[in-house]
Amino acid sequence: MSEIQLKYGCNPNQKPSRIYMEDGSELPVKVLNGRPGYINFLDAFNGWQLVKELKEATGLPAATSFKHVSPAGAAVGLPLDDTLAKIYWVDDLGELSPLACAYARARGADRMSSFGDFISLSDVCDADTARLIKREVSDGVIAPGYTEEAFKILMEKKKGAYNILEIDPNYQPAPLEKKQVYGITFEQGRNELDVNAGLLDNIVTDNKEIPESALIDMKISLIVLKYTQSNSVCYVKNGQAIGIGAGQQSRIHCTRLAGSKADNWFLRQSPKVMGLQFVDGLGRADRDNAIDVYIGDEYEDVLAEGVWQKNFKVKPEVFTREEKRAWLNGMTDVTVGSDAFFPFSDNIERAHKSGVKYIAQPGGSVRDDAVIECCNKYNMVMAFTGIRLFHH
């Protein structure tokens, strides 16, 4: 099939709509089930590139959770400890396959943003991963294949209408890509940058010690940024993005947004949150919403009389600002990547508050010296990649 007709484009008034191969060749993707839309395909193809490159860079199965053409989360398939399994709501599923662990991590980092995601998987979808996907609110999935059992499980989702795409893992796009804006055609070479350890050789700080685990996290941050709408900043820990700040016009706002998401990820692991007693039958999405409000500044909205009873068996104690700060002070060895240089040291100060130890960024600011000095103050390790990673 060389084209697929779509119901509409970005919005219902944008008709007609289709995806097609300009040279008339076969599309590298098959719709196995459902009727994916324009934005679904944008998420699927961007997400597939991301997980394909994560797998190539780390040798581990990878997954990403996309919303509106940026990742809400991305991860490789490292095992989950008991705490992560609980905050990702998968502690009832037993031991998971590496691919399922990757998606649990990708979905779990920012569950509020991942609601209604489009999923990309680097490997053939197995039954463990399908079972995890089935219970989440999601628009669709793309993978290089599906086991018979996994496909059967996914076909039970959305009353049989769940979008299931199969991508040809051997497909190689043309080296030039085009798009139109206002009837004008833009052409550029594809961003085929190979994110490897060599990009991280130029360490500009006094501390130059990067353990292997941090090296993997730095590569993950750069690959995630490569497929995130700019400006973007990405915090990573233990093989998964824990905070992604996408599409901001100011670098510091990217760093703050991503940092606040990383903070929320860590606060969800605190004893106060882990000990919340939810009412029986409360769904995962409602639990996520309650936690998000509880750990935020508007906590009174979920603790008010007549409200807390809808979510909790026992009224939670207030999670004070001081208690939250004390818990966040225990977050360490976090990596942060930036798709362009940090123009001021305020980005480093903000990153430090979220436990950042390792930084990967292009460098090239007239204030690089001040940024490096701030990193040295906190004994951070920073590598200048010399490569910008804008994505639009």
Regions found by a protein language model. Give the residues of each.
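Flexible, glycine/charged-enriched surface loops at secondary-structure junctions
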Residues: 57-65, 164-167, 230-237, 267-278, ...
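Conserved helix-loop functional segments at active or binding sites
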Residues: 53, 227, 264-268, 353, ...
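Gly-rich Lys/Arg/Thr-decorated short loops/hinges at beta-loop-alpha junctions or inter-strand turns
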Residues: 23-35, 109-115, 189-208, 286-307, ...
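Alpha-helix N-cap/helix-initiation motif
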Residues: 36, 40, 214, 247, ...
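Glycine-rich phosphate/pyrophosphate-binding loops
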Residues: 61-62, 67-72, 76-78, 232, ...
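C-terminal binding/interaction regions
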Residues: 117, 121-122, 135-165, 170-172, ...
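Glycine- and Gly-Pro-enriched alpha-helical subdomains that act as flexible
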Residues: 72-111, 242-342
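Active-site loops and adjacent core secondary-structure elements that bind or stabilize anionic groups
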Residues: 1-199, 214-232
